[in-house]
Amino acid sequence: PPYSIVWVYPKGTKSQIKSRIRELDALGVEGISFQGELQVDTISILGKGYAGIVVLGKMGRKKVAVKIRRNDSPRKNLEKEAVLLKIINKHKIGPKLIASSKNFLVMEYLDGEKVGDWVDGLKKNGNSSQLKLIIKKVLEDCYSLDRIGLDHGELSNLSKHVIVGKKTTIIDFESSSMDRKVSNVTSATQAFCIGSRISKIIGRVYKIPKKQKMITVLRRYKHEGTRESFENLLAVLKL
């Protein structure tokens, strides 16, 4: 069947496909529906990274996001990502992990749009107070991640890694690590405010401080990592 590629993307055997379908059944996922803005072959999906692809699933009456490990992934399983998700979920960050196995993560489905698209929609007369709330929420979550020593790893390309909706949160923790220096707050602040595509749009909606001032407060935060130096950053950003 044409959809079978999804289970073993980019390619795999019939027995691998059968085994993965059984594995997903065992997690309690009752159905998959192929929709979303991305495509593999001609199949619509929610997301695609180098470790997995994400599709929409159903558990009872609940929509879920199902991450399927890519067959060509250097990772032998998704267990490390599941462990990290459990840790950040305790701090109310990320999509809630519902179930996991070797090749699957079942997470709450977050209805919303990627922050890059959301910012695009603001145009010139966007709502600056709403924008500030979103930036503050993301930076607060980044501060929490810094405190627990978990580095997201991809926040310099923020546009794709935050969902804005009823629940605004950071997503895609497949490159995360607790074994390297954290730079969540600095990466996200730079993405929002310094020289990225979205920073140009944000700059039209509300006045971002001068680059040199930003670099100074970020340096202080990087050096101290304290709540006070973080509050100082928020104050400079007028958040």
Spell out what each predicted region is.
Residues 150-154, 165-239:
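C-lobe/activation-segment region of protein kinase-like
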Residues 93-135:
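Conserved structural core of kinase catalytic domains
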